[in-house]
Amino acid sequence: MARYVGRFAPSPSGPLHFGSLIAALGSYFQAKANNGIWLVRIEDLDPPREMPGASQLILEALKAYQLHWDGEVVYQSERHGLYQAQIDAWLDNGDAYYCQCTRKQIKEHGGFYPGTCRDKNLKEGAIRLKMTKPVARFLDQKHGMIEIPEQLVNEDFIIKRRDGLFAYNLAVVLDDIDQGVTEVVRGADLIEPTGRQISLYQILGQPEVSYLHLPLAMDDNGNKLSKQNHATAIDIENPKPALLHAMTFLGFDVPEEIKAASMNEILSWGCENWRLEQLPSEIEITPRFSNGTV
């Protein structure tokens, strides 16, 4: 049986906040409870959205919380050659094509791309992958079978944007394959692209990974804690309170004697007592798909 390989893959749009700590802890506990390895990958694909120095702040925060990763940190900004080579191969054999449709035009079709440019033989624009392996549902390790809207299932999706930036779905799958990831543990806000990512595994002829989506931390206004919503950075000078708060959020009932222990002892206890059944069953946010419908 292959060894468990998990990962935490934040984007450097700001320092770690409580919501991203949940994702880091959940992926860490799941990996270590399965006697696996835990990788860290910085998903710096979108420079306009990134904050200078955020990558280092994220790594420093993980160290402060005693979340020590295995191996070297991988940066997506250093892996463009991998992504472009795959795109070129698809373009050469006709599995991908250029598209010049605008967001307005797609919105006029209900928010889903109907394949307008598939047979136009254009030479520039965004690049879309022909959907030859549609995935209508997938099994989440906590939430069971997740159904995906039919229009989204069959959509030829973008793998490289018209501005030259590589699409998240392509990069994350190529990296997970390259790094040998066996299970993806992340926030429930990323349920939406999972079907497309499974399609990519199938198109690439690669064994699929399993998925576990963690409940999301919300603010008082019902918005997901995120850098875009100006979520407060976690305290790295006195990390224990936030660590214990995050563990409670993940369903742990931490004994008083463990609360008084060192950070390493708390994390070791967490690895020994991690159970998927203890996770809150609520996703905390309704998964929303491309056209704004559930």
From Swiss-Prot:
EC number(s) recorded for this UniProt protein: 6.1.1.-
The positions making up the signal sequence are none
Instruction: Detail which positions bind ATP.
Output: 227
Residues binding L-glutamate are: 7-11, 43, 168, 186
- UniProt keyword Zinc, yes or no: yes
Q: Please state what the protein is called.
A: Glutamyl-Q tRNA(Asp) synthetase
* Entry keywords, A to Z: Aminoacyl-tRNA synthetase, ATP-binding, Ligase, Metal-binding, Nucleotide-binding, Zinc
Motif 'HIGH' region: list the residue ranges: 10-20
Question: Gene for this protein?
Answer: gluQ
Top-level taxon in the UniProt lineage? Bacteria
Instruction: Tell me how the cofactor is bound.
Output: Binds 1 zinc ion per subunit.
Cofactor annotation: Zn(2+)
Q: Which organism is it from?
A: Vibrio parahaemolyticus serotype O3:K6 (strain RIMD 2210633)
Write down a Pfam family by its short name: tRNA-synt_1c
In which residues does the motif 'KMSKS' region occur? 224-228
Q: Which family does the record claim for this protein?
A: Belongs to the class-I aminoacyl-tRNA synthetase family. GluQ subfamily.
Example GO biological process term? Answer: tRNA modification
Q: Locate the residues binding Zn(2+).
A: 99, 101, 113, 117
Q: Does the record's keyword annotation contain Ligase?
A: yes
* Alphabetized GO MF terms: ATP binding; glutamate-tRNA ligase activity; zinc ion binding
Output the InterPro entries linked to this UniProt entry: Glu-Q_tRNA(Asp)_Synthase (IPR022380), Glu/Gln-tRNA-synth (IPR000924), Glu/Gln-tRNA-synth_Ib_cat-dom (IPR020058), GluQ/Sye (IPR049940), Rossmann-like_a/b/a_fold (IPR014729)
- Explain the purpose of this protein: Catalyzes the tRNA-independent activation of glutamate in presence of ATP and the subsequent transfer of glutamate onto a tRNA(Asp). Glutamate is transferred on the 2-amino-5-(4,5-dihydroxy-2-cyclopenten-1-yl) moiety of the queuosine in the wobble position of the QUC anticodon.
**GO cellular component terms given for this protein:** cytosol
